[in-house]
UniProtKB/Swiss-Prot annotation:
A cellular-component GO term for this protein: cytoplasm
Keyword check for DNA repair: yes
Designated name of the protein: UvrABC system protein C
Cited Pfam families: GIY-YIG, HHH_5, UVR, UvrC_RNaseH, UvrC_RNaseH_dom
Subcellular location(s) of the protein: Cytoplasm
Native source species: Haemophilus influenzae (strain 86-028NP)
Domain GIY-YIG: 13-91
Subunit structure: Interacts with UvrB in an incision complex.
GO molecular function, one term: excinuclease ABC activity
SMART domains found in the cross-reference section: GIYc, HhH1
PROSITE patterns assigned: GIY_YIG, UVR, UVRC
Example GO BP: SOS response
Protein task: The UvrABC repair system catalyzes the recognition and processing of DNA lesions. UvrC both incises the 5' and 3' sides of the lesion. The N-terminal half is responsible for the 3' incision and the C-terminal half is responsible for the 5' incision.
Domain UVR: residue ranges: 201-236
Amino acid sequence: MFDAKKFLADVSHEPGVYRMYDDKDQVIYVGKAKDLKKRLSSYFRKNLSSKKTEALVASIHHIDTMLTSSETEALLLEHNFIKLYQPRYNVLLRDDKSYPFILLTKERHPRITSYRGSKKFAGEYFGPYPHAGAVRETLSLLQKLFPVRQCENSVYSNRSRPCLQYQIGRCSAPCVQGYVSDEEYNQQVELARLFLQGKDQQVLDYLIGKMEQASRNLDFEQAARYRDQIQAVRSVIEKQFVSNERLDDMDIMSIAYQHGLACVQVMFIRQGKVLGNRSYFPKVPANTDLSELTETFVGQFYLQGHQGRSIPNSIIVDRQLAEKSELEQLLTEQAGRKVTIQESVKGDKSKYLQLAQVNAKAALNVQLKQSSRMSERYQALCDLLNLPEIKRMECFDISHTMGNQTVASCVVFNQEGPLKSDYRRFNIEGITGGDDYAAMEQALQKRYERDLEEDKIPDIIFIDGGKGQLNRALNVFQHLQVKWDKNRPHLIGVAKGVDRRAGQEVLIISKQDREIHLPDDSLALHLIQHIRDESHNHAISGHRKKRQKAFTQSGLETIEGVGAKRRQALLKYLGGLQGVKKATLDEIASVPGISLKLAETIFETLKND
């Protein structure tokens, strides 16, 4: 029993962070306070504010505290601890990915490309966009409007004639001399920049002026090209929502909550344009107040993400926040400029907020229906296997091409569906090419030879294959020397049936020593097919990446003494890989950073390749 009175006697009145632990020494809640003693004392009053707090207090075994120099510092530390410990009584944002940007590079002939990560390359960044699909859509649109290159520099610097993009009018071919002047190309780059900044009218005014000038000069062919470009830009603008207000960069957030599930809808607006929206489904403890949920989400969303998750000038929410000023101060410090959180808005901002609310409710309804279907399928599988409960399932598959670049995948499902953060791939090495049995054995060893936490032990492991694959898996588990309960998982083989068609799968249950043929309409079969297909796709995508990497390797990677900088120098000065292969020993030695001895090694290696 936790002695609250004894603990509180030594707690300071300073600002800080506290961590609450259960009897298994697991952090179950992280909080922060302007006055630690006052805040922690509130947990041990007779009349607690909610059932959630009652359940939390009943689980406390011990508490530790950490003093901070300010409440703002405590707020930042709180979010860092939440990310680290993932406590079950905190609201948890289950998305920590960076967001993609569009990058306009700073070069003689700039290119437009998608980019994700820290902003380390010279150029202008536009975004963030809610997902990669929104970036691809925008890049495709830009290609149709402005013939600016999107190719990699390795392609651009080694062209002797224009590529297909020039032939279909989506690039002006700056890579080949004589097709477009630097001035003409940079004009199109500037138009693309203005368009990405939301300055559509400036783009139209410029193009109209150029069209009229071409007409006056009797250059009707050029005037027609400008006319077509004007029509294309106008067509795009007409499809966009046009605000009468001058809108700042902002994110708009709305929350919908029903049956224990919450959806946070975020709309991204930059330079007055809606870049897109995205739905988030944070893990919410029972009886959590929606204002607390909003507050926690805002903090985690901007303070726990990667550098790609930029902070806008203003954040609009549909709930009153108790710690609004503290959040604003912290976000301002993080962004290096003033950031405001608005709880009451008018005009177009209000329309956007209403739109976010509608989308949040719609996304929540879809998620509730999917969760209901997933729950039904889980129950059907439990009934089929005579199991009281299934919390976690894992499935393995193998992918290769003629025995080369073999990759194994492991996908994970919990009661809510795919748990993509726990997906893994394994590079399979040291086996006979095409030996799927050995590949599966190696994948299982890599996955399960290490220590597993209690909640990471799967209840079911699906093996994509028949009895042979399943027997190899059983052999691996028989010889495992681990601390966790290796007998807990049920190993199940999923054979494809006689005709290898969907719906004819045969389940081979190792512990029950039986085979099950399921009807096409079986909910349990649908769940198994979902898991198996997910594993198959994950394995194939990993194999393709590995195969593409092997295909694009220059051969220089394997030469000792040739790192990334020297490789780039060789390719740059000798005109690509073919230029390096055709170069003489003296030509290789003339490249900056390449000694005569290293040049001899490179020359001999490529000659014998």
